[in-house]
């Protein structure tokens, strides 16, 4: 499924040191990829139900100009697992083939695009109408807090990511100040939803912000990861 380990690590710009620090065998990662490939058609069905029920032909209600979606490939799933276990081993150390869907919250991704930043309020109110937002329901422990029976709610508090110097006034009435972060290189509002038994990641930004976000994700992040590990190696 994943093929040769060395080729995989090179493809996803994962240093050997990072792979070793993740603490999962190649056989375990391949088992997760195979299980995921078996389930992926179901993820597409859930994505399509979300779009049909809540997004398609509802521009006036959502405030969206356009949108796009993606489902993670098996390779990108394994890449994320490796990186997350290195970044936060305590949180992800219990992840296995049997429970990885309780840990990975962005297998289904939705990105809504706005013409103007002010249109975000329309979309935010629309989500609140269809998904409960209660702090007592937020998932802090991926295993203990995963509720099989509860659906259509926000798994964590909505979060605003901004660049330093951006104005946060538009979000102040809706998002807690602790969840407005101004130390990023991109702009976006993030939601994690529980929908039909699956976690679904929703990101909202303007068309202008989308252009910069693409540059940041595809160029800056891989470069930062490689630079970090090169620096670590030089210090040893």
PLM regions and their residue ranges:
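Feature marking long nucleic-acid-engaging regions of large polymerase/nuclease enzymes
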Residues: 192-225
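Oligomerization/assembly interface segments of phage tail-like spikes and tubes
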Residues: 110-114, 200
């Amino acid at each position: 499924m994943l093929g040769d380990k060395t080729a995989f690590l090179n493809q996803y710009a994962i240093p050997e040191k990072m792979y070793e620090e993740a603490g999962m065998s190649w056989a375990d990662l391949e088992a997760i990829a195979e299980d995921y490939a078996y389930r992926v058609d179901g993820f597409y069905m859930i994505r399509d139900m979300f779009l049909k029920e809540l997004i398609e032909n509802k521009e006036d209600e959502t405030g969206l100009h356009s949108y796009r979606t993606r489902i993670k490939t098996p390779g990108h799933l394994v890449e994320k697992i490796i990186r997350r276990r290195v970044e936060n081993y305590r949180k992800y150390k219990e992840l296995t083939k049997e429970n990885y869907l309780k840990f990975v919250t962005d297998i289904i991704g939705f990105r809504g695009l706005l013409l103007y930043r002010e249109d975000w309020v329309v979309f935010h109110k629309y989500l609140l109408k269809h998904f409960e937002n209660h702090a007592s329901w937020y998932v802090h422990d991926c295993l203990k807090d995963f509720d099989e029976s509860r659906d259509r709610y926000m798994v964590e508090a909505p979060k605003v990511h901004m660049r330093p110097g951006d104005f946060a006034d538009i979000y102040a009435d809706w998002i807690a100040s602790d969840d407005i972060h101004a130390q990023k290189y991109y702009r976006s509002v993030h939601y994690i939803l529980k929908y039909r038994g699956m976690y679904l990641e929703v990101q909202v930004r303007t068309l202008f912000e989308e252009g910069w976000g693409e540059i940041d994700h595809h160029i800056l992040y891989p470069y930062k990861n490689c630079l970090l590990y090169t620096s670590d190696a030089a210090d040893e």
